[in-house]
């Protein structure tokens, strides 16, 4: 863009279409690259995230059935069909927004979500207070088991072909599986109802404390949102992610 003067002394701006086209084309290409990058990231995380959430919820239902309550089994929730467990907000919207936000400058790497809770009738368990601990613990333990499985997958990729295009994509998928499962396990172990950690704490507390504690469940999601927005949630999840980092480094070396 140049600035010229006319004979009457007035100045005007002279636009050069080539300059404008160049700037506009660059901006358009940059936007397309951002969209492609986001789409690729979603594809990489899709399978590990669906597996993480599906197996987590199925584990709750299976544990409940083994301990006396077949409610989830009868309702078809003890299944590897992800459609049965998907929650539109917790499984799709929230993780999607966090993923997009994490790609922005200064965005957080925190990624979590939730599925439709598996129905459990604690009164039908053989020992309700004790068994609710095992039912709640089954979900996070399943995620930690998947962390181990993805570590094995990562090691196999490193041994076979880490530098090929397919190997590079497989490494990204493995890292996605590791991070999603560790974050999901850590998030669910937060001792706030209705999360699994809250249910575990409820089972461990004496009755005189467990009852008033269970009454706080109605405020649970509000408390979790406050922790998320304030950044305090990171203090609970960070130690888990540090352990994961150490495990990945160990797998890479040995």
Task: Give short role names for the model-derived ranges.
Residues 6-8, 15-254:
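Hydrophobic transmembrane alpha-helices and their immediate loop junctions
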